[in-house]
Structures are given as C-alpha cells and as structure tokens.
C-alpha cells in the first residue's frame, strides 16, 4: 500500500463517526417501496451530500406520470459528480438504492431507529442498501479531501436511486437512457466478503383463470375457476421439478426456480368461483433465454387449460428482469477491487467472486455494455444481515472496510487511467 492509499485509509478511519451519523439519518428517513413515496428521502439525501461537500450534487426529477405507472407515489434520483484532473480518464459510476421493503413484523428494535448494539447498526434498509450509499459517498469524499502524491484523472459519479424494489426502470436504466450517466465502469451495491459478477434474471406472470359462477347447490351449472387453477398449479409444481435439472456453470447460482407467491379468487362460500388469479415468479439462470422461457411457460399453461371445457385463461407478463453477467474476472475493475480487498481485509485467500440467485440494478449497467461488479457493505451471505427480514443489520467494521476498499480501488483506476 503506497502513501496515498495509506492516507485514504487513515482519513476514512478518522471520519468513522460522521459515516455512522450519515447512515443513521438515512435509516431514520422512511423510504418503504411499496408504497413508494421516495421523493422525501431523495431530497434529504441531496441536502446531506451538499452539507458534506460532495461536488455537483443534483436532484434529478422523473416525470410524474411515469412514476405513477410503476405504482410508486413519488420519486427522484440523486447524482453527485466529481472530476479529477482534466476528467479525461475513466468515468466510474457508484450506484446504490435507497428505497426499501416495508419492515414487516418481528422486530426487536425500532426499524427506523438506526440503533447500534454490539458493533452493529439495526434498521430497515441499513444493509439493503443505505450502507452502500454511505460507503460510496465517503470513499469519494476521501479522494477529494486527501492530498495525493500521484495525480488522479477521470470522473466518479454517485448515482443514488429509489426504485430498485420495483425494478429500477426509473433509476439506473432511466439515468443511462437519458444520458445523465455515461459510465465506463460501474460498482453497484453488494457485499464486503465477496464480489458478485453475475445474477439471475426473473419473469413475473399473472395468470387469470375465468370460469362461470353458479349457486353452490348447483355446481354443475357453473365452471369452477379455482378447480381449473388447481390443475394449472399442479402442472407448474411438476414443471418446477424439471427446472432443477438445469444447472448453471456459474459459482453461486444453482438452477432455475419457480414460485407461486399469490393466489386470489372466489366470491363467497356458497358461490361457484368464476375467477381465480395467481402470481408466479420464474427465476432465470444467466444461461437461459428469457423469451424462450416465457414461451415454454405459456405453452405449459395453455396445454393444461385446453383440456378443461369452458375455461378461459389470460396470461400477463408483469416483469422481465434480465440476468447480469458473468463479467470476466480479468477486467481491470475486478482486478483492482480484488487486489485492494486482499490488502485491507484480514481474510485468508483471495476475494471470492461469484454469482447470486437474486436480481438487482446491476443488470441495467450490464445491458448497456458497462463492465460492472457488485460490491459494498454486508456479510458473507445476505441472511446474516437479515436483509428484507426483521432486525436487518450491518457490522460497522464492514462499513469501514468496504469504504476503504472502494476508495483504494477508485484510486487505482483513476491513477492508471484504465477505462
């Protein structure tokens, strides 16, 4: 580690309390999505960044009609752009999201309290992904505040968005499409003990089965939509077993999955149901083609219904989130990250690089042809942090470590001017 990196690490250590306070304020600002009223936290974050001295901070508003179409109430994106040298070096984007899933039940602490217990901060969104916002912010601040021996050249954009939980189309994708960010490389919210270079895609379907209502005393005069749906469900669960035979070659990703997450139907106990709706989640491994998977799914459902007289079915694709990666491990971004991880972390071996079965905003950067890696604040596995569960938390030492690694990685990329 050279003198410049030592100075970066020292600066981050000296500003630990400011980092904790910054994160605590974010956790204490509700940003549940749904309901998706996320303009207030975006405005709050913009103000905090300005007070910290982040350069060129802006609140980028999205068309209200487009926001309403996503089911959200309000939304804005927050950008902060820092230029080094003449800015002709690489343009690196750091992206994390500040919208969170609702707290749910089972908490032993205030989900919006940011309480610190035994070296961990607790709160909804502290792991997913307000801690990443904090790490990225203070990594950039360190680069601007520390006097360097080696000149830096390039640009680092903070891109903080608030619609990841509903797809990210008005966050990273919109910022890319509109030209607000033009990255050569991107780091997206992730974990501290591994780097993620691939993740699954996802298809969401709504299947509406339509029958004919009748009096329960005369069921033969109606067409039972729930009974027809049960046959669709049986076929889907059988199909799920066949999916397990498709294996991904990417470490950390196993096989495609299928989950029926919602069933709704019927009028009353004494009425033959004329309608039943189910929602299905079909995860795609990176090796799969989403269009072919959709075709296979539709054919399966229609085949079942074709054998049931009088029943109609409507299949609506609600979501198609494409997979991400795998990004080659020899890309300069991953190489720089891995080298700094090994220097700063007190862990045996090299930085683990693997895929994950969930899907994230990283896919938007990958689809735009941007070399992307997921790395940030968090444990070895998401379950340890209770992400999307009660008592979500992060270790404050992981916040420190991730910030140091990101700052040193940015330093290497900007010094070397590798794009």
What is each model feature region?
Residues 2-7, 196-198, 204-419:
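Metal-dependent amide/peptide-bond hydrolase catalytic core
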Residues 58, 92-94, 159, 185-187, ...:
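Hydrophobic/aromatic beta-strand patches that form the interior of the parallel beta-sheet core
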Residues 2-121, 145-152, 360:
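Acidic/His- and Gly-rich active-site-bordering loop/insert found
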Residues 59-60, 153-161, 187, 248, ...:
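Beta-strand segments within the central parallel beta-sheet cores of soluble alpha/beta enzyme folds
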Residues 121, 129-202, 418-419:
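Acidic/histidine-rich catalytic neighborhood of metal-dependent amide-processing enzymes
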Residues 111-125, 210-211, 386-388:
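Glycine/charged-rich beta-loop-alpha catalytic/anionic-binding loops adjacent to active sites
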